[in-house]
Swiss-Prot record:
A GO biological-process term: microtubule nucleation
Gene Ontology, cellular component aspect: cytoplasm; equatorial microtubule organizing center; gamma-tubulin ring complex; gamma-tubulin small complex; half bridge of mitotic spindle pole body; inner plaque of mitotic spindle pole body; interphase microtubule organizing center; mating projection tip
Record protein name field: Tubulin gamma chain
Gene: tug1
UniProt keyword list: Cytoplasm, Cytoskeleton, GTP-binding, Microtubule, Nucleotide-binding
Organism: Schizosaccharomyces japonicus
Amino acid sequence: MGREIITLQAGQCGNQVGSQFWQQLCLEHGICPDGTLEDFATEGLDRKDVFFYQSDDTRYIPRAILLDLEPRVVNNILSDTYGSLYNPENIFVATDGGGAGNNWAHGYAHAEKIFEDIVDMIDREAEGSDSLEGFSLLHSIAGGTGSGLGSYLLERLNDRFPKKIVQTYSVFPNNRSVSDVVVQPYNSLLTLKRLTLNADAVVVLDNAALAHIAADRLHIQNPTFHQQNQLVSTVMSASTTTLRYPGYMNNDLVSIIASLIPTPRCHFLSTSYTPFTSQQVEDARTIRKTTVLDVMRRLLQPKNRMVSVNPGKQSCFISILNIIQGEADPNDVHKSLLRIRERKLATFIPWGPASIQVALSKKSPYIKTNHRVSGLMLANHTSIASLFKRTLDQYDRLRKRNAFLDQYRKESIFENSLDEFDNSREVVADLIREYEACEQPEYLSM
Protein backbone atom coordinates (compact mmCIF):
# COMPACT_ATOMS: atom_id res chain seq x y z
CA MET A 1 0.00 0.00 0.00
CA GLY A 2 1.98 2.98 -1.22
CA ARG A 3 1.18 6.54 -0.27
CA GLU A 4 4.07 7.93 -2.23
CA ILE A 5 5.50 11.42 -1.94
CA ILE A 6 7.46 13.05 -4.76
CA THR A 7 10.13 15.49 -3.56
CA LEU A 8 10.90 18.56 -5.68
CA GLN A 9 14.19 20.33 -4.88
CA ALA A 10 14.40 23.85 -6.31
CA GLY A 11 17.49 26.07 -6.29
CA GLN A 12 20.68 26.05 -4.25
CA CYS A 13 19.11 25.76 -0.79
CA GLY A 14 16.50 23.19 -1.85
CA ASN A 15 19.11 20.93 -3.41
CA GLN A 16 21.61 21.23 -0.57
CA VAL A 17 18.95 20.45 2.05
CA GLY A 18 17.55 17.68 -0.15
CA SER A 19 20.96 16.09 -0.55
CA GLN A 20 21.33 15.85 3.26
CA PHE A 21 17.77 14.55 3.59
CA TRP A 22 18.40 11.64 1.20
CA GLN A 23 21.66 10.76 2.96
CA GLN A 24 19.78 10.68 6.26
CA LEU A 25 16.99 8.46 4.82
CA CYS A 26 19.56 6.07 3.35
CA LEU A 27 21.25 5.70 6.75
CA GLU A 28 17.89 5.12 8.46
CA HIS A 29 16.73 2.49 5.97
CA GLY A 30 20.05 0.68 5.48
CA ILE A 31 20.50 1.82 1.88
CA CYS A 32 24.05 2.17 0.48
CA PRO A 33 25.13 5.36 -1.37
CA ASP A 34 24.62 3.55 -4.69
CA GLY A 35 21.04 2.54 -3.80
CA THR A 36 21.69 -1.12 -2.98
CA LEU A 37 20.51 -2.52 0.34
CA GLU A 38 23.13 -3.03 3.06
CA ASP A 39 23.77 -6.70 3.95
CA PHE A 40 22.45 -6.15 7.48
CA ALA A 41 19.24 -4.42 6.37
CA THR A 42 16.04 -6.44 6.29
CA GLU A 43 12.89 -5.94 4.25
CA GLY A 44 9.48 -5.42 5.75
CA LEU A 45 10.13 -3.44 8.93
CA ASP A 46 9.76 -0.10 7.25
CA ARG A 47 8.11 1.52 4.25
CA LYS A 48 10.86 2.59 1.90
CA ASP A 49 8.38 2.92 -0.96
CA VAL A 50 6.95 6.23 0.29
CA PHE A 51 10.16 8.03 -0.72
CA PHE A 52 12.02 5.47 -2.88
CA TYR A 53 11.18 3.14 -5.73
CA GLN A 54 13.14 0.11 -6.87
CA SER A 55 14.74 0.00 -10.30
CA ASP A 56 14.90 -3.14 -12.43
CA ASP A 57 18.20 -4.09 -10.77
CA THR A 58 16.46 -3.64 -7.34
CA ARG A 59 18.43 -0.50 -6.43
CA TYR A 60 16.49 2.05 -4.37
CA ILE A 61 16.07 5.38 -6.15
CA PRO A 62 14.66 8.53 -4.52
CA ARG A 63 11.34 9.83 -5.85
CA ALA A 64 13.13 13.16 -6.22
CA ILE A 65 13.39 15.78 -8.94
CA LEU A 66 16.41 18.10 -8.75
CA LEU A 67 15.91 21.51 -10.37
CA ASP A 68 18.25 24.47 -10.65
CA LEU A 69 18.98 27.33 -13.02
CA GLU A 70 22.74 27.10 -12.49
CA PRO A 71 24.79 23.90 -12.40
CA ARG A 72 27.23 24.26 -9.47
CA VAL A 73 25.20 22.77 -6.59
CA VAL A 74 23.64 19.92 -8.58
CA ASN A 75 27.05 19.04 -10.08
CA ASN A 76 28.53 18.92 -6.57
CA ILE A 77 25.74 16.55 -5.46
CA LEU A 78 26.27 14.28 -8.48
CA SER A 79 30.04 14.10 -7.98
CA ASP A 80 29.64 13.36 -4.25
CA THR A 81 29.43 9.95 -2.51
CA TYR A 82 25.65 9.70 -3.04
CA GLY A 83 25.76 11.02 -6.63
CA SER A 84 24.76 7.72 -8.23
CA LEU A 85 21.67 7.42 -5.98
CA TYR A 86 19.49 9.73 -8.11
CA ASN A 87 17.70 9.02 -11.37
CA PRO A 88 19.65 11.05 -13.98
CA GLU A 89 16.41 11.57 -15.94
CA ASN A 90 15.03 13.51 -12.95
CA ILE A 91 17.66 16.23 -12.97
CA PHE A 92 17.10 19.54 -14.71
CA VAL A 93 19.77 22.22 -14.87
CA ALA A 94 19.19 25.17 -17.22
CA THR A 95 21.44 24.95 -20.28
CA ASP A 96 22.49 28.62 -20.18
CA GLY A 97 23.43 28.04 -16.52
CA GLY A 98 23.19 31.70 -15.55
CA GLY A 99 20.92 31.20 -12.54
CA ALA A 100 18.08 33.54 -11.53
CA GLY A 101 20.32 36.33 -10.24
CA ASN A 102 18.47 36.40 -6.90
CA ASN A 103 15.43 37.75 -8.72
CA TRP A 104 12.02 36.11 -8.19
CA ALA A 105 10.68 37.42 -11.51
CA HIS A 106 13.58 35.92 -13.43
CA GLY A 107 13.16 32.54 -11.71
CA TYR A 108 9.41 32.61 -12.38
CA ALA A 109 9.79 33.59 -16.06
CA HIS A 110 12.48 30.97 -16.59
CA ALA A 111 10.25 28.32 -15.04
CA GLU A 112 7.54 29.13 -17.60
CA LYS A 113 9.99 28.50 -20.44
CA ILE A 114 11.25 25.16 -19.13
CA PHE A 115 8.04 23.85 -17.64
CA GLU A 116 7.41 21.31 -20.42
CA ASP A 117 10.66 19.55 -19.49
CA ILE A 118 9.87 19.63 -15.78
CA VAL A 119 6.28 18.46 -16.19
CA ASP A 120 7.50 15.40 -18.13
CA MET A 121 9.60 14.41 -15.11
CA ILE A 122 6.76 15.04 -12.66
CA ASP A 123 4.23 13.12 -14.77
CA ARG A 124 6.62 10.19 -15.17
CA GLU A 125 7.19 10.01 -11.40
CA ALA A 126 3.45 10.35 -10.70
CA GLU A 127 2.59 7.57 -13.15
CA GLY A 128 5.24 5.34 -11.54
CA SER A 129 3.46 5.59 -8.17
CA ASP A 130 0.79 3.14 -7.00
CA SER A 131 -1.22 5.75 -5.14
CA LEU A 132 0.54 9.10 -5.06
CA GLU A 133 -0.34 11.10 -1.97
CA GLY A 134 1.35 14.35 -2.82
CA PHE A 135 4.39 16.51 -3.35
CA SER A 136 7.00 17.98 -1.06
CA LEU A 137 8.83 21.12 -2.23
CA LEU A 138 12.21 22.02 -0.70
CA HIS A 139 13.30 25.60 -1.36
CA SER A 140 14.26 28.93 0.14
CA ILE A 141 12.09 32.01 -0.34
CA ALA A 142 14.78 34.72 -0.46
CA GLY A 143 16.83 34.08 -3.61
CA GLY A 144 15.69 33.73 -7.21
CA THR A 145 15.32 30.06 -8.15
CA GLY A 146 13.84 28.61 -4.95
CA SER A 147 11.42 31.52 -4.76
CA GLY A 148 10.53 32.15 -8.43
CA LEU A 149 10.74 28.65 -9.88
CA GLY A 150 9.30 27.32 -6.60
CA SER A 151 6.31 29.68 -6.89
CA TYR A 152 5.64 28.66 -10.48
CA LEU A 153 5.80 24.98 -9.50
CA LEU A 154 3.29 25.49 -6.67
CA GLU A 155 0.78 27.11 -9.04
CA ARG A 156 1.15 24.43 -11.71
CA LEU A 157 0.96 21.52 -9.24
CA ASN A 158 -2.38 22.88 -8.04
CA ASP A 159 -3.67 23.06 -11.62
CA ARG A 160 -2.35 19.68 -12.68
CA PHE A 161 -2.91 17.63 -9.51
CA PRO A 162 -5.81 19.38 -7.75
CA LYS A 163 -6.54 16.42 -5.43
CA LYS A 164 -2.95 15.81 -4.32
CA ILE A 165 -1.40 17.32 -1.20
CA VAL A 166 1.29 19.95 -1.70
CA GLN A 167 3.53 20.41 1.30
CA THR A 168 6.70 22.49 1.51
CA TYR A 169 9.81 22.88 3.63
CA SER A 170 10.47 26.59 3.15
CA VAL A 171 13.65 28.20 4.44
CA PHE A 172 13.04 31.84 5.37
CA PRO A 173 15.94 34.31 5.39
CA ASN A 174 17.49 35.79 8.50
CA ASN A 175 15.51 39.01 8.10
CA ARG A 176 16.88 40.50 11.30
CA SER A 177 20.32 41.04 9.82
CA VAL A 178 21.59 42.77 6.70
CA SER A 179 21.24 40.45 3.72
CA ASP A 180 23.56 40.08 0.77
CA VAL A 181 20.38 39.87 -1.33
CA VAL A 182 18.98 43.41 -1.28
CA VAL A 183 15.74 42.39 -3.01
CA GLN A 184 15.07 39.61 -0.50
CA PRO A 185 11.85 41.29 0.81
CA TYR A 186 10.42 41.40 -2.74
CA ASN A 187 11.26 37.74 -3.38
CA SER A 188 9.92 36.65 0.02
CA LEU A 189 6.61 38.50 -0.35
CA LEU A 190 5.94 37.17 -3.87
CA THR A 191 6.70 33.60 -2.70
CA LEU A 192 4.59 33.98 0.45
CA LYS A 193 1.56 34.68 -1.72
CA ARG A 194 1.98 31.26 -3.41
CA LEU A 195 2.71 29.49 -0.13
CA THR A 196 -0.56 30.94 1.19
CA LEU A 197 -2.74 30.19 -1.84
CA ASN A 198 -1.15 27.09 -3.39
CA ALA A 199 0.22 24.92 -0.56
CA ASP A 200 -1.67 22.72 1.93
CA ALA A 201 1.05 22.86 4.59
CA VAL A 202 4.26 24.87 4.90
CA VAL A 203 6.96 23.87 7.38
CA VAL A 204 8.74 27.16 8.10
CA LEU A 205 12.44 27.06 8.93
CA ASP A 206 14.44 30.22 9.28
CA ASN A 207 18.15 30.82 9.11
CA ALA A 208 18.18 33.15 12.13
CA ALA A 209 16.71 30.48 14.41
CA LEU A 210 18.91 27.74 12.93
CA ALA A 211 22.04 29.80 13.61
CA HIS A 212 20.80 30.54 17.14
CA ILE A 213 20.12 26.84 17.86
CA ALA A 214 23.56 25.90 16.55
CA ALA A 215 25.18 28.44 18.88
CA ASP A 216 22.98 27.90 21.92
CA ARG A 217 22.22 24.16 21.91
CA LEU A 218 25.19 22.80 19.98
CA HIS A 219 27.85 25.34 20.98
CA ILE A 220 28.83 25.99 17.36
CA GLN A 221 29.37 29.76 17.13
CA ASN A 222 29.49 30.30 13.37
CA PRO A 223 27.65 27.36 11.87
CA THR A 224 28.33 26.56 8.24
CA PHE A 225 25.41 26.16 5.82
CA HIS A 226 26.30 22.47 5.82
CA GLN A 227 25.70 22.27 9.59
CA GLN A 228 22.45 24.28 9.31
CA ASN A 229 21.30 21.94 6.54
CA GLN A 230 22.01 18.99 8.85
CA LEU A 231 19.59 20.56 11.34
CA VAL A 232 16.95 20.92 8.61
CA SER A 233 17.39 17.37 7.30
CA THR A 234 17.08 16.00 10.86
CA VAL A 235 13.73 17.79 11.19
CA MET A 236 12.60 16.56 7.78
CA SER A 237 13.45 12.95 8.49
CA ALA A 238 11.82 13.13 11.96
CA SER A 239 8.66 14.69 10.49
CA THR A 240 8.33 11.76 8.08
CA THR A 241 9.07 8.89 10.52
CA THR A 242 5.40 8.03 11.04
CA LEU A 243 5.08 7.64 7.25
CA ARG A 244 8.17 5.43 6.99
CA TYR A 245 7.64 3.38 10.19
CA PRO A 246 3.86 3.42 10.26
CA GLY A 247 1.84 2.85 13.43
CA TYR A 248 -1.89 3.15 13.96
CA MET A 249 -2.10 6.90 13.46
CA ASN A 250 -0.48 9.66 11.42
CA ASN A 251 0.74 7.15 8.88
CA ASP A 252 -0.04 9.32 5.89
CA LEU A 253 0.40 12.99 5.08
CA VAL A 254 -3.30 13.79 5.04
CA SER A 255 -3.81 12.62 8.63
CA ILE A 256 -0.84 14.67 9.87
CA ILE A 257 -2.14 17.77 8.11
CA ALA A 258 -5.72 17.21 9.31
CA SER A 259 -4.54 17.05 12.92
CA LEU A 260 -2.53 20.27 12.64
CA ILE A 261 -4.53 22.52 10.35
CA PRO A 262 -8.15 23.07 11.44
CA THR A 263 -8.66 26.07 9.10
CA PRO A 264 -7.10 25.90 5.63
CA ARG A 265 -5.58 29.40 5.51
CA CYS A 266 -3.55 28.96 8.72
CA HIS A 267 -1.26 26.23 7.45
CA PHE A 268 2.21 27.50 8.38
CA LEU A 269 3.92 25.14 10.83
CA SER A 270 6.94 25.63 13.04
CA THR A 271 9.15 22.89 14.44
CA SER A 272 11.24 22.09 17.51
CA TYR A 273 13.55 19.11 17.88
CA THR A 274 15.46 17.62 20.80
CA PRO A 275 18.08 16.42 21.46
CA PHE A 276 20.43 17.45 18.66
CA THR A 277 23.65 15.47 18.96
CA SER A 278 26.91 15.10 17.09
CA GLN A 279 25.39 12.16 15.24
CA GLN A 280 23.15 14.57 13.34
CA VAL A 281 25.32 17.67 13.39
CA GLU A 282 29.09 17.46 13.35
CA ASP A 283 30.79 18.82 16.50
CA ALA A 284 27.58 19.18 18.52
CA ARG A 285 27.58 18.63 22.29
CA THR A 286 25.22 16.11 23.81
CA ILE A 287 22.44 16.33 26.36
CA ARG A 288 22.57 13.56 28.95
CA LYS A 289 19.05 12.98 30.12
CA THR A 290 16.18 12.17 27.80
CA THR A 291 13.02 11.02 29.53
CA VAL A 292 9.71 11.43 27.71
CA LEU A 293 8.74 14.31 30.01
CA ASP A 294 12.11 15.94 29.55
CA VAL A 295 11.83 15.74 25.75
CA MET A 296 8.22 17.00 25.70
CA ARG A 297 9.07 19.89 28.00
CA ARG A 298 12.10 20.90 25.95
CA LEU A 299 10.01 20.87 22.77
CA LEU A 300 7.82 23.61 24.26
CA GLN A 301 10.75 25.88 25.12
CA PRO A 302 10.87 28.86 22.72
CA LYS A 303 14.67 28.59 22.40
CA ASN A 304 14.29 25.19 20.72
CA ARG A 305 11.98 26.53 18.02
CA MET A 306 13.37 26.70 14.52
CA VAL A 307 11.52 29.91 13.76
CA SER A 308 12.43 33.29 15.22
CA VAL A 309 9.11 34.88 16.09
CA ASN A 310 7.99 37.62 18.47
CA PRO A 311 5.07 36.18 20.45
CA GLY A 312 2.52 38.75 21.63
CA LYS A 313 0.46 38.56 24.83
CA GLN A 314 -2.34 36.76 22.98
CA SER A 315 -0.16 34.40 20.93
CA CYS A 316 -1.22 30.79 21.32
CA PHE A 317 -1.01 27.33 19.84
CA ILE A 318 -3.67 26.31 17.33
CA SER A 319 -2.41 22.72 17.44
CA ILE A 320 0.60 20.59 18.40
CA LEU A 321 1.72 17.18 17.18
CA ASN A 322 4.69 15.63 18.99
CA ILE A 323 6.43 12.78 17.19
CA ILE A 324 8.34 10.83 19.86
CA GLN A 325 10.93 8.35 18.59
CA GLY A 326 12.53 5.59 20.58
CA GLU A 327 11.72 3.78 23.81
CA ALA A 328 8.62 5.68 24.93
CA ASP A 329 6.09 4.07 27.26
CA PRO A 330 2.51 5.29 26.59
CA ASN A 331 2.06 5.67 30.38
CA ASP A 332 5.00 8.08 30.50
CA VAL A 333 3.45 10.04 27.65
CA HIS A 334 0.14 10.27 29.50
CA LYS A 335 1.86 11.45 32.71
CA SER A 336 3.89 14.00 30.76
CA LEU A 337 0.77 15.43 29.13
CA LEU A 338 -0.89 15.79 32.55
CA ARG A 339 2.20 17.52 33.95
CA ILE A 340 2.35 19.93 31.00
CA ARG A 341 -1.34 20.76 31.44
CA GLU A 342 -0.99 21.26 35.23
CA ARG A 343 1.92 23.62 34.74
CA LYS A 344 0.18 25.43 31.87
CA LEU A 345 3.29 25.12 29.71
CA ALA A 346 1.29 25.56 26.49
CA THR A 347 -1.45 28.12 25.81
CA PHE A 348 -4.02 27.08 23.21
CA ILE A 349 -6.63 28.91 21.13
CA PRO A 350 -9.84 29.66 23.05
CA TRP A 351 -12.11 28.04 20.42
CA GLY A 352 -10.56 24.58 19.95
CA PRO A 353 -9.30 21.54 21.85
CA ALA A 354 -6.38 22.37 24.16
CA SER A 355 -4.57 19.11 23.61
CA ILE A 356 -1.13 18.03 22.51
CA GLN A 357 -1.36 15.11 20.10
CA VAL A 358 1.38 12.52 20.36
CA ALA A 359 2.54 9.97 17.81
CA LEU A 360 4.95 7.28 19.00
CA SER A 361 7.32 6.10 16.34
CA LYS A 362 10.08 3.53 15.96
CA LYS A 363 13.70 4.56 15.63
CA SER A 364 15.77 3.19 12.79
CA PRO A 365 17.36 -0.09 13.93
CA TYR A 366 20.47 0.73 11.86
CA ILE A 367 21.50 3.93 13.62
CA LYS A 368 22.87 3.67 17.12
CA THR A 369 22.01 6.74 19.20
CA ASN A 370 23.21 7.67 22.66
CA HIS A 371 19.77 8.88 23.73
CA ARG A 372 16.72 6.73 24.46
CA VAL A 373 14.10 9.17 23.27
CA SER A 374 14.07 12.02 20.78
CA GLY A 375 11.18 14.26 19.84
CA LEU A 376 9.95 16.54 17.08
CA MET A 377 7.19 19.06 17.64
CA LEU A 378 5.15 20.22 14.66
CA ALA A 379 3.18 23.21 15.87
CA ASN A 380 0.68 25.65 14.45
CA HIS A 381 1.24 28.83 16.50
CA THR A 382 -0.27 32.27 15.91
CA SER A 383 3.06 34.04 16.56
CA ILE A 384 4.23 32.90 13.11
CA ALA A 385 2.40 36.00 11.86
CA SER A 386 5.22 38.13 13.34
CA LEU A 387 7.59 36.58 10.80
CA PHE A 388 5.25 37.62 7.96
CA LYS A 389 4.93 41.10 9.48
CA ARG A 390 8.71 41.55 9.36
CA THR A 391 8.70 40.58 5.68
CA LEU A 392 5.86 43.03 5.02
CA ASP A 393 7.62 45.90 6.84
CA GLN A 394 10.84 45.33 4.92
CA TYR A 395 8.91 45.14 1.65
CA ASP A 396 7.10 48.41 2.43
CA ARG A 397 10.39 50.18 3.11
CA LEU A 398 11.89 49.10 -0.21
CA ARG A 399 8.72 49.73 -2.18
CA LYS A 400 8.26 53.24 -0.75
CA ARG A 401 11.55 54.17 -2.41
CA ASN A 402 10.71 52.20 -5.58
CA ALA A 403 14.11 50.59 -5.10
CA PHE A 404 15.42 47.96 -7.54
CA LEU A 405 12.12 47.64 -9.42
CA ASP A 406 13.72 47.85 -12.87
CA GLN A 407 15.15 44.34 -12.45
CA TYR A 408 11.58 43.04 -12.07
CA ARG A 409 10.07 45.11 -14.89
CA LYS A 410 12.32 43.26 -17.35
CA GLU A 411 10.12 40.16 -17.00
CA SER A 412 6.68 39.80 -18.58
CA ILE A 413 4.77 39.42 -15.29
CA PHE A 414 5.80 43.00 -14.31
CA GLU A 415 6.15 44.46 -17.80
CA ASN A 416 2.93 46.48 -17.83
CA SER A 417 2.23 46.99 -14.14
CA LEU A 418 3.37 46.22 -10.61
CA ASP A 419 -0.05 44.83 -9.65
CA GLU A 420 1.48 41.47 -8.76
CA PHE A 421 3.36 43.16 -5.89
CA ASP A 422 0.22 44.88 -4.60
CA ASN A 423 -1.80 41.71 -4.92
CA SER A 424 0.85 39.67 -3.05
CA ARG A 425 0.99 42.28 -0.31
CA GLU A 426 -2.78 42.04 0.14
CA VAL A 427 -2.67 38.22 0.38
CA VAL A 428 0.06 38.35 3.05
CA ALA A 429 -1.73 41.12 4.99
CA ASP A 430 -4.90 38.96 4.95
CA LEU A 431 -2.86 36.00 6.22
CA ILE A 432 -1.56 38.07 9.16
CA ARG A 433 -5.12 39.20 9.96
CA GLU A 434 -6.31 35.58 9.84
CA TYR A 435 -3.73 34.49 12.42
CA GLU A 436 -4.62 37.45 14.65
CA ALA A 437 -8.32 36.58 14.37
CA CYS A 438 -7.47 33.00 15.47
CA GLU A 439 -6.54 34.37 18.90
CA GLN A 440 -10.11 35.58 19.54
CA PRO A 441 -12.75 33.35 21.25
CA GLU A 442 -15.36 34.29 18.63
CA TYR A 443 -13.12 33.31 15.68
CA LEU A 444 -15.47 30.63 14.31
CA SER A 445 -18.44 33.00 14.26
CA MET A 446 -16.59 35.98 12.75
